[in-house]
């Protein structure tokens, strides 16, 4: 089973959009996948679920339940550690790790774990999402929304991953804003300064077919389990 932790360079960069497209390509290619969203916030306007959880379930055509993919959810779209403190919820690294590792014995080809926001999103006053990734010791897929500031955000995230010896399996350029200029130049700059080639360049209204090459890379034997 391949395992990947999906994070963004920031919040609202398209992590869940990328996750759902990866799910779609796995479903079309008969790759057995499961995408978890351990911590979620922001209730959907269409149901009592958090919006990201609902999107993932819809991508799977509801063959999984919310409880199978999500452990902790908050109705308000607020930083997890803030709303957790307000509602007296403990976002425990150990509990999250156990929730994720409980899926390791399932018959899956690939397991995605979609994080909450960016690499250093706080879970409490003394822990961040980075602590969970370090505890799991699995590779990261980084989503960067190509816009003003993305070069700095992407390089900072990659540098922090490198500093903690966390493998970057790939980074995805989410080019969903047609008004942004010099997209290729920004991607090239990130590649040159980070030393990592862009794994996929995704445009607005991308089809799942745009993710086939990326899915082949992720499922390949060369990728660490």
UniProtKB/Swiss-Prot annotation:
Query: Catalytic residues?
Result: 37
GO cellular component entries: cytosol
Q: Per its record, what are the GO molecular function terms?
A: ATP binding; dethiobiotin synthase activity; magnesium ion binding
Record-linked InterPro entries = DTB_synth_BioD, P-loop_NTPase
Reactions this protein catalyses: (7R,8S)-7,8-diammoniononanoate + CO2 + ATP = (4R,5S)-dethiobiotin + ADP + phosphate + 3 H(+)
Instruction: Write down the EC number.
Output: 6.3.3.3
Keyword Ligase among UniProt keywords: yes
List ligand-binding residues for ATP.
12-17, 52, 114-117, 174-175
As cofactor, the record names: Mg(2+)
* Major place of residence: cytoplasm
Q: What HAMAP family does its record include?
A: BioD
How is the subunit organization of this protein annotated in UniProt?
A: Homodimer.
Q: Which family does it belong to?
A: Belongs to the dethiobiotin synthetase family.
Q: What is this protein called?
A: ATP-dependent dethiobiotin synthetase BioD
Query: Gene encoding this polypeptide?
Result: bioD
């Amino acid at each position: 089973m391949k395992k990947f932790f999906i994070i963004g360079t920031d919040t609202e960069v398209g992590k869940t959009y990328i996750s759902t497209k990866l799910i779609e390509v796995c479903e079309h290619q008969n790759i057995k996948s499961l995408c978890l969203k351990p911590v979620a916030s922001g209730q959907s306007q269409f149901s009592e679920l958090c919006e990201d959880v609902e999107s993932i379930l819809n991508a799977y055509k509801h063959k999984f339940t919310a409880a199978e993919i999500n452990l902790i959810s908050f109705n308000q779209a607020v930083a997890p550690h803030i709303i957790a403190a307000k509602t007296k919820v403990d976002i425990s690294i150990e509990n999250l790790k156990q929730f994720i590792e409980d899926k390791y014995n399932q018959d899956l080809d690939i397991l995605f774990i979609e994080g909450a926001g960016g690499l250093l999103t706080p879970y409490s006053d003394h822990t961040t999402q980075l602590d969970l990734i370090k505890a799991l010791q699995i590779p990261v897929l980084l989503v960067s929304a190509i816009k003003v500031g993305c070069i700095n955000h992407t390089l900072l995230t990659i540098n922090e991953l490198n500093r903690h010896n966390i493998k970057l399996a790939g980074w995805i350029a989410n080019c969903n804003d047609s008004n942004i200029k010099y997209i290729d130049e920004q991607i090239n700059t990130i590649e040159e300064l980070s030393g990592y080639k862009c794994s996929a360049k995704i445009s607005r209204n991308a089809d799942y077919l745009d993710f086939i090459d990326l899915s082949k890379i992720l499922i390949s034997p060369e990728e660490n389990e």
